[in-house]
Regions:
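Thiol-based oxidoreductase modules, predominantly thioredoxin-like and allied folds used
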Residues: 63, 88-105, 120-132
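Thiol-/selenol-based redox modules, centered on thioredoxin-like
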Residues: 137-140, 144-191
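Short, internal strand/loop/helix patches
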Residues: 108-157
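Loop/turn elements at helix/coil->beta-strand transitions in domains of secreted/extracellular proteins
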Residues: 55-59, 85-90, 118-123, 166-169
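Bacterial Sec-dependent N-terminal signal peptides
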Residues: 1-25
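Short active-site neighborhood of thiol/selenol oxidoreductases, capturing the structured segment around
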Residues: 52-72, 77, 90-95
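Typically the conserved alpha-helix immediately C-terminal to a functionally engaged Cys/Sec
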Residues: 69-83, 104-107
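N-terminal "domain-start" segment that seeds a small globular fold
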Residues: 19-52, 72, 137
């Protein structure tokens, strides 16, 4: 009798483990990571911008500001874009006023500032929020591991860089203080 109970318990335990493994596997499959291509946004000029048009390209997404100590990075971003745009790199700027109110301008004022001061020709999107309760869906994707599959992060300041591979997946988050021309960034572009 005791032997029958033990055999019954072992058989039941194996069945439970098998069912738990199947549930875990299904759960992981249903948490498929998203990609950047699902997003459509507005440019500074109120035109539609569809990230799906960038399939097959490396994308650097940067939150920008016009009145920040890091604003001169616009020049490096533009030089990088000029150098590598024909090698499948696209830089996409998102002006944001989240840090010390360093992007107070309207979309039209930001567009004029970028063109006159830095000759910016890479795509610049309409001003958004990159953190807080009103965080834009693009930045929800960039900062939440459950969406991007890489890591949870928080935008720490203006000019934080998010590197997206040719499949539309986040592969690296770069500090605002790291210049766009840093070896780490150049290596990623050329890699």
């Amino acid at each position: 009798m005791f032997l029958a109970i033990v055999v019954s318990f072992i058989a039941c335990n194996k069945k439970i483990n098998k069912n738990m493994n199947a549930i875990a596997s299904t759960s992981l499959e249903s948490q498929e990571i998203e990609d950047i291509y699902q997003f459509k946004v507005k440019t500074l000029n109120d035109e539609d911008f569809d990230f799906s048009t960038l399939k097959g390209k490396k994308i650097m997404i940067v939150n920008t500001a016009s009145k920040c100590g890091l604003t001169p990075q616009y020049e490096d971003l533009q030089n990088l874009y000029d150098t590598y745009k024909n090698e499948n790199l696209v830089i996409v700027g998102f002006p944001a006023n989240n840090f010390a109110k360093q992007e107070p301008g309207t979309n039209a004022e930001i567009a004029e500032f970028c063109l006159i001061n830095y000759g910016v020709t890479f795509p610049m999107m309409a001003k958004i929020s990159v953190k807080g309760d009103d965080i834009h869906p693009v930045y929800q994707f960039l900062t939440q591991k459950s969406k991007n599959g890489l890591e949870d992060s928080e935008v720490s300041w203006n000019f934080q860089k998010y590197l997206i591979n040719e499949e539309g997946h986040l592969v690296k988050v770069i500090s605002p203080k790291t210049l766009p021309t840093d070896e780490e960034v150049i290596g990623w572009i050329k890699g």
